Amino acid sequence: MDLLLILKAVIMGIVEGITEFLPISSTGYLILSADLMSFWTKEKADLFIVVIQLGAILAVIYEYWGRLWHALMGLITGKSEGPNALKNPRQLGLSLIVATIPVMLVGFTLADQIKEYLFNPYTVAIMLILGGLLIFYVERKQIPVIAEEAEDVSLKTALLIGLMQCLALIPGTSRSGSTIIGALWLGVSRKAAAEFSFFLGIPVIIGAGLLDLLKHKDVLSSGQDWLILGVGVLVSFVVGLLCIRWLVDWVSRRDFTIFAWLRIITGIIVLLVAWIFGYTIQG
């Protein structure tokens, strides 16, 4: 058993758990981490990067199970009763469905092309910088709040957030970043924007992870390969759960400017390294 490879999987799980819900691009940081550690072959690393996100999104389901159940029941029956009851459960359920449709269509059509041509440090660096500039722009605008809670998000706003999420298919953009910042831009409160982004990631990440695993499961040729993947998923679940709780508290007190600086600085460093040393994704 390769203990060093297991340690690298643990590190990748920590990176995923920390970055999945922050507006800094978990996929981008996973690609860079895999390159820096020479983690697995390119085919196995690419599969790992997509599937490991299942752990973090399972943390969302665990943390918000009560509200998600009420949203599902509200979508079916129109009612929400008991603990964690929502004032408008059907609206939340419909908004999440509407916001999910665009990225499902685009992702299903272009997933393989995106992985083949855009999973590299250059793309990550450029999108990190552009995303950081967008965060600066939105944070400096005085935008009136029109949706205090996640269930207040209208279908029109949900569709626009869903279109913003399509940008996150490009590594370095950040799914949480595009949806949270997009929601803030459209007048959703900070806490509601974060929670709507958490919920929106459930069908997208589960769908992408399971689809990629089914299509490329033959890449995992041994029991150890599956163990490595399982370790990464488990670690990302635990770390992701801690990060969710921290982020909800953070957004109620501060803005995302620090993450804009982090994105831009990281992007510039990666571009400089790529230019000076010819740094490219392993292949």
From Swiss-Prot:
<dbReference type="GO" id="GO:0046677">
    <property type="term" value="P:response to antibiotic"/>
</dbReference>
<feature type="transmembrane region" description="Helical">
    <location>
        <begin position="153"/>
        <end position="173"/>
    </location>
</feature>
<dbReference type="Pfam" id="PF02673">
    <property type="entry name" value="BacA"/>
</dbReference>
<feature type="transmembrane region" description="Helical">
    <location>
        <begin position="228"/>
        <end position="248"/>
    </location>
</feature>
<keyword id="KW-0961">Cell wall biogenesis/degradation</keyword>
<feature type="transmembrane region" description="Helical">
    <location>
        <begin position="4"/>
        <end position="24"/>
    </location>
</feature>
<dbReference type="GO" id="GO:0009252">
    <property type="term" value="P:peptidoglycan biosynthetic process"/>
</dbReference>
<feature type="transmembrane region" description="Helical">
    <location>
        <begin position="45"/>
        <end position="65"/>
    </location>
</feature>
<dbReference type="InterPro" id="IPR003824">
    <property type="entry name" value="UppP"/>
</dbReference>
<keyword id="KW-0997">Cell inner membrane</keyword>
<feature type="transmembrane region" description="Helical">
    <location>
        <begin position="258"/>
        <end position="278"/>
    </location>
</feature>
<dbReference type="GO" id="GO:0008360">
    <property type="term" value="P:regulation of cell shape"/>
</dbReference>
<feature type="transmembrane region" description="Helical">
    <location>
        <begin position="118"/>
        <end position="138"/>
    </location>
</feature>
<keyword id="KW-0133">Cell shape</keyword>
<keyword id="KW-0046">Antibiotic resistance</keyword>
<feature type="transmembrane region" description="Helical">
    <location>
        <begin position="194"/>
        <end position="214"/>
    </location>
</feature>
<dbReference type="GO" id="GO:0050380">
    <property type="term" value="F:undecaprenyl-diphosphatase activity"/>
</dbReference>
<dbReference type="GO" id="GO:0071555">
    <property type="term" value="P:cell wall organization"/>
</dbReference>
<keyword id="KW-0573">Peptidoglycan synthesis</keyword>
<comment type="similarity">
    <text>Belongs to the UppP family.</text>
</comment>
<feature type="transmembrane region" description="Helical">
    <location>
        <begin position="91"/>
        <end position="111"/>
    </location>
</feature>
<keyword id="KW-0472">Membrane</keyword>
<protein>
    <recommendedName>
        <fullName>Undecaprenyl-diphosphatase</fullName>
        <ecNumber>3.6.1.27</ecNumber>
    </recommendedName>
</protein>
<keyword id="KW-0378">Hydrolase</keyword>
<keyword id="KW-1003">Cell membrane</keyword>
<keyword id="KW-1133">Transmembrane helix</keyword>
<keyword id="KW-0812">Transmembrane</keyword>
<dbReference type="GO" id="GO:0005886">
    <property type="term" value="C:plasma membrane"/>
</dbReference>
<comment type="function">
    <text>Catalyzes the dephosphorylation of undecaprenyl diphosphate (UPP). Confers resistance to bacitracin.</text>
</comment>
